[in-house]
Amino acid sequence: MEGLGRSCLWLRRELSPPRPRLLLLDCRSRELYESARIGGALSVALPALLLRRLRRGSLSVRALLPGPPLQPPPPAPVLLYDQGGGRRRRGEAEAEAEEWEAESVLGTLLQKLREEGYLAYYLQGGFSRFQAECPHLCETSLAGRAGSSMAPVPGPVPVVGLGSLCLGSDCSDAESEADRDSMSCGLDSEGATPPPVGLRASFPVQILPNLYLGSARDSANLESLAKLGIRYILNVTPNLPNFFEKNGDFHYKQIPISDHWSQNLSRFFPEAIEFIDEALSQNCGVLVHCLAGVSRSVTVTVAYLMQKLHLSLNDAYDLVKRKKSNISPNFNFMGQLLDFERSLRLEERHSQEQGSGGQASAASNPPSFFTTPTSDGAFELAPT
């Protein structure tokens, strides 16, 4: 990191007009970012799954930044900061004394940005020092903090990482899921090596007893459906037919969502979860499928596991990954699962507070960041 640090004075000058536009990335936790931040900074929202991809080189850091993912690095610098500016090494000058753990978000991003040609630096002393020296250049989402000179900022805070990731500008189902099925092997969970294409199972994959994950081909295979006792079929596409809808032996539900970064799949989570529950309560098999069985159907299945088994996003994703190694939800769907995870935690906290006779905090409903389009708002949770 030697020579890559920039002082608070340098940043103050860069933020003063008419300086070139500076991209500020806040590498702290979402909670700290929402509480207070440097004016104009974007929060880096990287779950462990995407951070692992970034470290392994499976994901380009360019895809995380605003703008088209294939655009060249901008001439303006990128400045990253954390809370304290790194760790001090004894006996060294402050300007050369800051370092980060190899696994940290800031250290990983700084290294990858430099490797990809960005003018990337870190802020010496981090947010704590800058806030102390330049409080007028900081802002907060909390309205009217007594004694604070930081400006409150209404509305959702901007986030970098998942919302800006896009698989294509106007991709069809065949150009997204099907292509990603063949290109995404080995990009997700550590230690998972997908089998050769010719050796992949031809039947749907069992995730839980009676819960199956599959593709369009699986949904059209009457023999395998009968063999597995599947009577309920959740079709997560806008245009694939329900092949046996006229057959009274099957119950269908269709979620008309394309595999595209602009789609809000999370608003269908409650009814999808209810449909799966109905099938399992009847001791019937249920198939959740999309086109290739790697993105939309995986997202719905992971959401179901998170709510019904009280799993974290990482644990639910890894459970599905162990069963089906080639899964690859598009990045905005991953962001919606992150929001869903936060909502589940808030719901559980609210239930605990009610059970203990307390009252839920009035600030317990922060905005969701990835439920696009934004007019759809946040989703309500189905009862567990």
Curated annotation (Swiss-Prot):
Its EC number is 3.1.3.16, 3.1.3.48. One of its GO terms (biological process) is MAPK cascade. It catalyses: O-phospho-L-tyrosyl-[protein] + H2O = L-tyrosyl-[protein] + phosphate; O-phospho-L-seryl-[protein] + H2O = L-seryl-[protein] + phosphate; O-phospho-L-threonyl-[protein] + H2O = L-threonyl-[protein] + phosphate. Its main location: cytoplasm. It is an enzyme of class 3 (hydrolase). The modification Phosphoserine is found at S16, S262, S351. InterPro entries: Dual-sp_phosphatase_cat-dom, MKP, Prot-tyrosine_phosphatase-like, Rhodanese-like_dom, Rhodanese-like_dom_sf, Tyr_Pase_dom, TYR_PHOSPHATASE_DUAL_dom. Residues 359-375 have a biased composition (Polar residues). The active site is at C290. SUPFAM superfamilies: (Phosphotyrosine protein) phosphatases II, Rhodanese/Cell cycle control phosphatase. Residues 203-346 form the Tyrosine-protein phosphatase domain. Residues 348-384 are annotated as: Disordered. One of its GO terms (molecular function) is protein tyrosine/threonine phosphatase activity. GO terms for cellular component: cytoplasm; cytosol; nucleus. It comes from the Eukaryota. Keywords: Cytoplasm, Hydrolase, Phosphoprotein, Protein phosphatase. It is found in: Cytoplasm. Residues 18-139 form the Rhodanese domain. Belongs to the protein-tyrosine phosphatase family. Non-receptor class dual specificity subfamily. Inactivates MAP kinases. Has a specificity for the ERK family. This is Dual specificity protein phosphatase 9. It comes from Homo sapiens (Human). The lineage of its organism: Eukaryota, Metazoa, Chordata, Craniata, Vertebrata.
